[in-house]
């Protein structure tokens, strides 16, 4: 009985302590959750301010005042993260050394843009634009023109004696030729346009060949992005292509641009919107058909390297809620770094209309991050409440069992005591009666 009762006592005391551990865990979780409630409130205020700043009725002075408050709020978010602690354990500042973490990409509010997350990268698909389409980019309205580049008329050249009529190009209702004349050359009977690479600064030329082939204008759009690019036909003619001339033609409060130019502008804005809150900005991934630095190919699909920001990894601690050393008695609590870097709003700006517009998405992500963390903490707290109830139940019943072995059964003993007491009193009564009878006989004899 002693061995069994001591084993039970060990379990009872361990479970009592485990229940207290769980209660301490609830207190720690409630401390973190309460701090995040204030972080949530500050982010909601920042969202309100960014939305206000994005409105065109605000002056630069107004936006500066808005930016001042946003700066104060981000500073306070960092302070809360750095100082919130329970029993000398900091709860919201993460743990370990700082590491680079990815920041979510954003679509810059562009219509029809699809972002497909692929870990460190995002596949971006832009809406295909056709002639006559209206598109809004960075708060400006554009109309897509009918070709991919503006082409000026071929300049006539002295000595040109072969008239041509190849690859007509229509720009804003005017028909242009790729080239109008080629000089005769006694060394060859043919011609072919040499294709220039994307963003080539060297002119494309027509070289004499032994076989006549049709010229191609594949890279017109790439030339379009380079002001002053030329195409020479032998040494007799020059064509200039300058897409910048398309940017500035008003058409019903819109600017006529090429589809490729629109893709370039959209790409640049997506990069800008996806770089908010980063230490290292997002970039377009360089590959065989996708130039990183200047978005030269600017097609409807490209890959974006996510921007990164440095902050500490999640804080993780275990609550031991059992009497045994079994690892299943551990409940793990994870709390992410909740400073401005971890929330993706580090250094966020809303002092221009466009920056404020992009800030709205970044703040929305931060709010979602805090909501997710609070939800996780709430789930842990609810679990701990059930754990405490179960532990208390086990303690109560184990204590009862141990008591039956180790302790006196007071009810049974009281029954026995009462019975024995009654019997003793009855015996005394009978003896007294017997003594009285003897006295009566003696009295008669006298």
Indicate where each model-derived feature is located:
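Primary detection of the long, small/polar-rich alpha-helical "axial" segments characteristic
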Residues: 1-173, 185-188, 193-194, 201-446
